[in-house]
Structure formats: structure tokens, C-alpha cells
A protein has these predicted regions:
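Phosphate-handling catalytic cores of nucleic-acid transaction enzymes
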Residues: 1-345
Length: 345
């Protein structure tokens, strides 16, 4: 991130606190009930969105000229000091447990892998999966050793471009076409520093970045109040939500066709106006260094909109071949995109 001189209060940077009641799809709304307000709730929301993308295998969108086809996988980066509540993001991982259990497919790719091992796992998982790390210690060592190779993989993943590697030692060739990998990485500023060392290569502009600037306040509800034999409310809730999401995954898989996400003409014009305005503000503050983040944020925003729309589709009906973004989800993706831009600065 660039050190910003913009005068922003903490409240200005929050996402969930600025959402209206019931603005999110029901599954996300319920899943967020385990988190307190403020940054903790925001971190959980970004984890939920990143993980839910895997459960929407049929969703697609077009972007750019000429049109490029994108699926909903997000690359998300949370930067936070120690003891700031990053562990809340592990709840997002629970949402995919039913998919793993019902299909026998492995979803998660270990983040503590070398770049070569990461490619092997992607190949083994048929180019689909989630790289998940709430503490980046081991990955940081990988980045220091093979930053260029990791950066190349991330750049290809963002655009779903073919990733390939030839290992000279055993003449092994790996090629992964149309990779659809989501990433949720988090760590302290020192842990993520290797990713930030070269702003000009555009690597960080491919991530939805969220920065926590303060430690958690002490919570006087941390004491154990459960009686022996109780099943925690959170476990029961996430078991049910995981089952619902697993059903949605199978519904899309069985449809055997894709569902394209579109914005209305009015929504497209609103985004154009928003980014013209944002471009003027951030260009004056940061010059050309922020260009890549501004130009890639519309893709990230539309991916978020695609996830929201996919979670709202009625599973009692056949999967549609196209869906127009609702005004409700459009306002949500605009808000999240705007806040993420502020954090990227």
C-alpha cells in the first residue's frame, strides 16, 4: 500500500458498518452474526466472499474490450497487527466443509508451499481451489526466495490465464489452463512486506486489500459461559450454512451450463462516473503509482457483485443463463469497492 495523506477517520474505512440492514444475501447476513462490529466484521465478510466464490462454479461475467471472461474468484489480502482478530476469517473456511465432504474434492491448497508445489497442487485440483492463510510466516519465506515466480502465478490467476512450468531437474512440464483459484492471505505488515516491495509490477493491484490499523479492544464476553455438553451456536450455524452452500454448489454443477452476470446500462454508467471521480482524487494524491489499482478495481467489484448475485439465485428453479445485478447488490459492490480503494491507498 502507498502511505496515504488522505484524512480518513476509522469509520470512513469500515464496510459492514455502512451497510443497510438485510442488504446482504441471507447466507452472508447469518454468517456475519458471529462477529462483532467494526474491523472484525469486515474481515469476516471478506473471508466469506472469498470462500463462497468456490461454491459458485457456474458464475461468469464479461469485462473489457475485447471481452474477457471472468469467474468470481477473489484474491484478498488482510494486513493487520498481531492480536487484531484475524482468526475470525477461519469461519469462512467452514462454509466449504460440506462441499469437501459430499464431493470428496479437496478445496484448500496449502499456503506454506513453494511456487513449484503450489503449481503441482493447482494441477492436482484441476485448476480450482482456495489458497488460505491467516498467518503468512511460511509463505513469506517462499516470497523472499521466489518472489518473481509467485508473482507470475498470481498475475495469471487473476486473469484466468494459462500457468505453466518446466522443471529442468526431471523434465516435468505442468500446464494449468483457465486457473480458477481464490486466495485469502493475511498477515502483519512485516509478513506481507515481500508482496509490497515492488509497487510498479502491479501485483498488489490484483488483490482486494484491507488494512486493520488497530488491535482488538478487550472483549469482556470472552469468558467461557457454555455448560458441559453444549454445542457452540457458531458450530451449529456454520454446519447449516455449509450444507446450504453445498446444495448450491451441486445445483450449479448439475446444471451443466454457465450463468453470466451483467450490469444494467444505468449501473455501468454509475461505475464509469465513480471511477472518473476516484481517478481524479487519487491521481492528484499519488500520481501514476495508483493507476493499476484503479483500473483493476472494477473487475474486483464486479466479481463481488457476481458472488452476491449467485448467492441469491433461486435453487427451486433451473439455473438461468444470465442474471442482471439487483440494485441492492449493486449498492453493496459499490460500497465495498470504494472502501477497498481507500484501504489500498
Amino acid at each position: 500500500m502507498i502511505q496515504s495523506n488522505l484524512n480518513m477517520e476509522k469509520q470512513d474505512l469500515l464496510i459492514c458498518s455502512n451497510l443497510k440492514p438485510n442488504q446482504l444475501p441471507k447466507l452472508l447476513d447469518e454468517a456475519l452474526s458471529v462477529a462483532a462490529e467494526g474491523e472484525t466484521r469486515d474481515m469476516l465478510l471478506l473471508s466469506l466472499l472469498t470462500n463462497c466464490a468456490y461454491a459458485l462454479p457456474a458464475m461468469r461475467m464479461l469485462h473489457g474490450r475485447p471481452h474477457h471472461i471472468y469467474s468470481p474468484e477473489l484474491l484478498t489480502m488482510i494486513v493487520a497487527p498481531a492480536a487484531s482478530g484475524k482468526g475470525i476469517m477461519n469461519y469462512g473456511r467452514l462454509l466449504l466443509q460440506a462441499i469437501e465432504g459430499n464431493t470428496g474434492k479437496k478445496v484448500y491448497i496449502p499456503a506454506n508451499s513453494s511456487a513449484s508445489a503450489l503449481l503441482k497442487m493447482m494441477d492436482k485440483y484441476d485448476g480450482r481451489g482456495v489458497v488460505f492463510a491467516t498467518e503468512m510466516d511460511t509463505l513469506t519465506q517462499t516470497l523472499r526466495a521466489a518472489y518473481g515466480q509467485f508473482g507470475d502465478i498470481v498475475r495469471c490467476i487473476f486473469e484466468h490465464e494459462t500457468v505453466s512450468q518446466l522443471r529442468r531437474q526431471n523434465n516435468e512440464f505442468i500446464e494449468i489452463r483457465n486457473p480458477r483459484i481464490a486466495m485469502l492471505l493475511s498477515g502483519t505488515p512485516n509478513q506481507v512486506a515481500p508482496l509490497l516491495r515492488n509497487r510498479e509490477n502491479g501485483l498488489m493491484s490484483r488483490f482486494a486489500c484491507y488494512v486493520v490499523n488497530s488491535r482488538m479492544e478487550f472483549d469482556d464476553q470472552v469468558w467461557d459461559t457454555a455448560t458441559e455438553g453444549d454445542t457452540p451456536y457458531e458450530a451449529v450455524l456454520y454446519d447449516r450454512l455449509a450444507s446450504e452452500l453445498g446444495d448450491r454448489y451441486l445445483w450449479m454443477e448439475e446444471a451443466r451450463h454457465e450463468c453470466y452476470f451483467y450490469l444494467s446500462d444505468t449501473q455501468l454508467e454509475t461505475i464509469r462516473r465513480m471511477f472518473r471521480s476516484e481517478y481524479d482524487v487519487y491521481s492528484k494524491e499519488f500520481g501514476d503509482l495508483f493507476d493499476a489499482s484503479l483500473k483493476r478495481m472494477p473487475v474486483i467489484m464486479k466479481r463481488i457483485g457476481m458472488i452476491l448475485a449467485g448467492l441469491r439465485l433461486d435453487m427451486t428453479k433451473p439455473l438461468p443463463e444470465r442474471v442482471i445485478c439487483s440494485d441492492e447488490d449493486f449498492q453493496t459492490m459499490l460500497l465495498i469497492g470504494h472502501k477497498l480503494l481507500m484501504h489500498a491507498a
